[in-house]
Protein backbone atom coordinates (compact mmCIF):
# COMPACT_ATOMS: atom_id res chain seq x y z
CA UNK A 1 0.00 0.00 0.00
CA UNK A 2 1.53 3.25 -1.10
CA UNK A 3 -0.32 5.33 1.51
CA UNK A 4 -0.56 2.63 4.19
CA UNK A 5 -4.30 3.20 4.43
CA UNK A 6 -7.00 0.58 4.01
CA UNK A 7 -10.74 0.74 4.41
CA UNK A 8 -12.63 -2.53 4.67
CA UNK A 9 -16.41 -2.48 4.48
CA UNK A 10 -18.50 -5.65 4.40
CA UNK A 11 -22.27 -5.59 4.06
CA UNK A 12 -23.85 -6.25 7.44
CA UNK A 13 -20.68 -5.42 9.38
CA UNK A 14 -18.93 -2.24 10.44
CA UNK A 15 -16.16 -0.55 8.49
CA UNK A 16 -12.53 -0.73 9.56
CA UNK A 17 -9.72 1.66 8.75
CA UNK A 18 -6.32 0.05 9.16
CA UNK A 19 -7.89 -2.53 11.46
CA UNK A 20 -9.81 -0.08 13.67
CA UNK A 21 -13.58 0.40 13.66
CA UNK A 22 -14.68 3.79 12.31
CA UNK A 23 -17.86 5.87 12.24
CA UNK A 24 -19.21 8.73 10.16
CA UNK A 25 -19.81 12.15 11.69
CA UNK A 26 -22.97 13.13 13.53
CA UNK A 27 -23.30 16.42 11.63
CA UNK A 28 -26.98 17.26 11.38
CA UNK A 29 -27.07 20.62 9.59
CA UNK A 30 -26.09 21.59 6.06
CA UNK A 31 -24.50 24.81 7.31
CA UNK A 32 -22.01 22.73 9.31
CA UNK A 33 -21.39 20.10 6.62
CA UNK A 34 -18.24 19.57 4.56
CA UNK A 35 -19.12 18.55 1.00
CA UNK A 36 -16.78 16.85 -1.48
CA UNK A 37 -17.11 16.17 -5.19
CA UNK A 38 -14.42 14.97 -7.57
CA UNK A 39 -14.59 17.90 -10.01
CA UNK A 40 -17.02 20.69 -10.97
CA UNK A 41 -17.17 19.34 -14.53
CA UNK A 42 -19.24 16.40 -13.23
CA UNK A 43 -22.18 18.77 -13.10
CA UNK A 44 -23.33 20.12 -16.45
CA UNK A 45 -24.45 23.70 -16.93
CA UNK A 46 -28.09 22.59 -16.92
CA UNK A 47 -30.17 20.95 -14.24
CA UNK A 48 -27.35 19.05 -12.47
CA UNK A 49 -25.23 22.17 -12.19
CA UNK A 50 -28.08 24.23 -10.78
CA UNK A 51 -28.97 21.56 -8.24
CA UNK A 52 -25.35 21.15 -7.14
CA UNK A 53 -24.80 24.91 -6.91
CA UNK A 54 -27.96 25.30 -4.84
CA UNK A 55 -26.71 22.66 -2.44
CA UNK A 56 -23.14 24.00 -2.38
CA UNK A 57 -24.42 27.45 -1.41
CA UNK A 58 -26.03 25.96 1.70
CA UNK A 59 -23.19 23.87 3.14
CA UNK A 60 -20.36 25.02 5.35
CA UNK A 61 -17.51 23.95 3.08
CA UNK A 62 -17.09 22.66 -0.48
CA UNK A 63 -13.97 20.87 -1.70
CA UNK A 64 -13.12 19.24 -5.00
CA UNK A 65 -10.73 16.37 -5.63
CA UNK A 66 -10.11 13.14 -3.87
CA UNK A 67 -12.12 10.79 -6.08
CA UNK A 68 -12.84 7.65 -4.02
CA UNK A 69 -10.64 8.95 -1.16
CA UNK A 70 -13.43 11.41 -0.29
CA UNK A 71 -15.71 8.47 0.53
CA UNK A 72 -13.05 7.11 2.86
CA UNK A 73 -12.85 10.50 4.55
CA UNK A 74 -16.63 10.42 4.93
CA UNK A 75 -16.43 6.98 6.57
CA UNK A 76 -13.77 8.34 8.94
CA UNK A 77 -15.98 11.27 9.96
CA UNK A 78 -13.78 13.96 8.36
CA UNK A 79 -16.23 14.75 5.54
CA UNK A 80 -20.02 14.84 5.83
CA UNK A 81 -21.23 14.62 2.22
CA UNK A 82 -20.02 13.40 -1.17
CA UNK A 83 -22.23 14.34 -4.12
CA UNK A 84 -21.31 13.28 -7.64
CA UNK A 85 -22.68 12.76 -11.14
CA UNK A 86 -21.65 11.02 -14.34
CA UNK A 87 -20.52 7.87 -12.52
CA UNK A 88 -20.67 4.29 -13.75
CA UNK A 89 -21.80 1.51 -11.41
CA UNK A 90 -18.21 0.27 -11.09
CA UNK A 91 -17.23 3.72 -9.77
CA UNK A 92 -19.43 3.42 -6.68
CA UNK A 93 -20.39 -0.18 -5.90
CA UNK A 94 -17.28 -0.93 -3.80
CA UNK A 95 -17.72 2.33 -1.89
CA UNK A 96 -21.22 1.56 -0.64
CA UNK A 97 -20.26 -1.01 2.07
CA UNK A 98 -17.43 1.24 3.26
CA UNK A 99 -19.77 4.22 3.75
CA UNK A 100 -22.76 2.27 5.05
CA UNK A 101 -20.67 0.09 7.37
CA UNK A 102 -19.41 3.25 9.07
CA UNK A 103 -22.97 4.46 9.64
CA UNK A 104 -23.43 6.54 6.50
CA UNK A 105 -26.10 6.29 3.84
CA UNK A 106 -25.88 6.17 0.05
CA UNK A 107 -28.43 6.73 -2.69
CA UNK A 108 -28.96 8.35 -6.05
CA UNK A 109 -30.20 11.95 -6.20
CA UNK A 110 -33.81 10.77 -5.90
CA UNK A 111 -33.14 8.83 -2.70
CA UNK A 112 -33.25 5.46 -4.44
CA UNK A 113 -30.82 2.60 -3.83
CA UNK A 114 -27.80 2.49 -6.14
CA UNK A 115 -27.20 -0.41 -8.51
CA UNK A 116 -26.11 -1.46 -11.99
CA UNK A 117 -28.89 0.49 -13.66
CA UNK A 118 -28.47 3.72 -11.66
CA UNK A 119 -28.23 6.91 -13.69
CA UNK A 120 -24.78 7.94 -12.43
CA UNK A 121 -25.86 10.38 -9.71
CA UNK A 122 -24.57 9.47 -6.25
CA UNK A 123 -25.12 10.93 -2.81
CA UNK A 124 -23.19 9.68 0.21
CA UNK A 125 -24.06 11.25 3.55
CA UNK A 126 -22.81 10.77 7.09
CA UNK A 127 -26.34 10.06 8.30
CA UNK A 128 -30.00 9.98 7.29
CA UNK A 129 -30.67 13.48 8.61
CA UNK A 130 -28.09 14.99 6.26
CA UNK A 131 -29.22 12.81 3.38
CA UNK A 132 -32.79 14.03 3.75
CA UNK A 133 -31.67 17.66 3.85
CA UNK A 134 -29.59 17.17 0.69
CA UNK A 135 -32.44 15.43 -1.12
CA UNK A 136 -34.57 18.53 -0.52
CA UNK A 137 -32.09 20.39 -2.77
CA UNK A 138 -31.48 17.67 -5.35
CA UNK A 139 -35.07 16.47 -5.84
CA UNK A 140 -36.48 19.78 -7.06
Stretches with model-predicted labels:
Residues 90:
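Acidic donor-binding loop at a coil-to-helix junction in glycosyltransferase catalytic cores
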Residues 76-81, 104-105:
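Alpha-to-beta junction loops
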Residues 64-65, 83, 108:
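A generic structural-conservation signal
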Residues 39, 85-87, 110-112:
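Short secondary-structure boundary segments
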Residues 1-71, 119-140:
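Acidic beta-strand-loop-alpha-helix segment within the catalytic core
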Residues 72-75, 93-101:
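Hydrophobic residues within well-ordered alpha-helices
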Residues 103-119:
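Acidic, metal-binding active-site segment of PIN/NYN-like and related structure-specific nucleases
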Residues 81, 100-101, 125-126:
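Short, hinge-like loop/turn segments at secondary-structure boundaries
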